[in-house]
Design a protein with these regions (language model features):
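N-terminal accessory/pre-domain segments preceding catalytic cores
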Residues: 24-178, 298-408
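Bacterial N-terminal signal peptides that target proteins for export
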Residues: 1-9
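Hydrophobic/aromatic-rich core segments of domains that either
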Residues: 222-297
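Conserved active-site-adjacent core of cysteine acyl-enzyme catalytic domains
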Residues: 156, 204-213, 218, 222-229
């Protein structure tokens, strides 16, 4: 919760005047001299009452580990707001308790504060900010704005904790294939985090990256910030997006990435689709690729971004995992699915994905493959049973993803 304490800063102006009555040219010359003295005295008094303000220190908002990072939140601000951002950034980097920035409105400082944390997932040691306004709270008012930073960790522990996080990050990044392109690196991080980090709303520090890199347990905030942190260390553009998500319109966080000239959405939290129960029990899906480099039409079916950031157009679906791997279906064709299932068994595959473009086609597939006997018929045709032999399979399915996965 932000704490706002308003104080009124009163400035006194001391006015000195010299009255010298008279007329005529000779007296006018004398008056001019006295007016000059008056101006000099007033100027000296003004300098005593209003000393020149010290320049508030600023950090370089464009500086990052590899010099290729683009602070998306910073770039979205006005010039005056960017200055506030740099002032706040400097205070955070110096571990200050109170950071002073130029006079501004409450709306400005709220926005700037949010943009700093949108751009910097590495600031794990801060939870929230409380504000103390000195002045009238307007952008052109006298005085300044003080932000009191709230730490979630003892300052003496920040550097050692940071070192632990960086060590884990470097170890994980070292496992990324050396020949991976930008998409390959994003895909690896997406898979790695989803397979090595559990989701638990009760875990400590779940709103920052400590939970991921030190404990491997987190929630959406940790997943999205860890994704941003790792990709940023590899020189890949990635920013944080917040909003709400289905099915209960809950607060959620995900990412926006850039490959070449195009933008895509990534939601590492939803890499596990939470498959429904099947005839064999609850199936745990290894990973869903629905939200790996997806376009807006895919994401907006389940996600609603807030208006904190201006978002670019995201219409390209060149990196749709299921299209790239030939498991995307624009309609349901039972004969086609039947032959794919039999071929999958003959080829000895471990799994077969079926990702559908629309809900109607997906529901037809569920009716045939989950509730019907389509898979059983395919197994009977493709598998040569010996005496007493059985053949088992599992199927997982997600209504939100419109995805079915058969495990042989």
């Amino acid at each position: 919760m932000r704490k706002r304490v308003y104080s009124l800063l009163l400035w006194g102006t001391l006015l000195v005047s010299f009255l010298f009555p008279g007329c005529g040219r000779g007296i006018e010359t004398e008056a001019e001299t006295k007016e000059s003295v008056t101006e000099s005295v007033q100027k000296k008094i003004y300098q005593v009452c209003e000393p020149e303000k010290e320049k508030i220190p600023e950090a370089d908002a464009l500086q990052y580990i590899n010099g290729e990072y683009i602070p998306y939140g910073y770039e979205s601000l006005t010039e005056d707001q960017q200055k506030l951002y740099r002032q706040l950034l400097n205070g955070i980097l110096e571990y200050k308790d109170i950071v002073t920035v130029d006079a501004c409105t409450e709306a400005d400082i709220n926005l700037v504060n949010n943009m700093v944390f949108v751009d910097h997932p590495e600031f794990f040691w801060l939870d929230q900010q409380s504000y103390t306004f000195q002045g009238d709270g307007s952008a052109d008012g006298a005085g300044s704005v003080d932000l009191q930073l709230v730490y979630n960790i003892d300052k003496a522990e920040i550097e050692s904790t940071k070192a632990g996080i960086e060590a884990s990050a470097d170890q994980w990044i070292a496992q990324v294939p050396a020949d991976a392109d930008t998409y390959g690196k994003i895909k690896y991080i997406y898979e790695f985090l989803s397979q090595n980090t559990a989701y638990d709303q009760s875990c400590p520090n779940n709103q920052n990256i400590q939970s991921v890199f030190l404990n491997q347990v987190t929630v959406c905030a940790g997943f999205s910030k860890a994704t941003q942190y790792l990709l940023g260390r590899m020189g890949i553009f990635c920013t944080l997006i917040t909003g709400k998500a289905a099915p209960n319109d809950e607060e959620h966080a995900w990412n926006l990435v850039k490959i070449g000239e195009n933008y895509y959405y990534v939601d590492t939290t939803w890499a596990n689709p939470g498959f429904s129960e099947t005839q064999e029990g609850v199936v745990v899906q290894e990973i869903s690729y629905t939200y790996l480099c997806c376009d807006a039409s895919t994401l907006l079916a389940t996600h609603t971004p807030d208006d904190l950031l201006p978002l670019p157009e995201t219409v390209d679906d060149s990196y749709n995992y299921y299209k790239m791997n030939g498991t995307w279906y624009s309609y349901y064709d039972e004969n086609e699915i039947y032959h794919i299932l039999t071929n999958s068994i003959w080829e000895g595959k471990e799994r077969e994905d079926f990702k559908f473009a629309d809900a109607e086609s997906y529901q037809q597939a569920v009716a045939a493959m989950v509730n019907g006997d389509l898979i059983e018929r395919a197994v009977r045709e493709a598998y040569q049973f010996g005496e007493g032999e059985t053949y088992q399979w599992n199927i997982g399915y997600s209504d939100e993803d419109k995805l079915l996965t058969v495990y042989w």
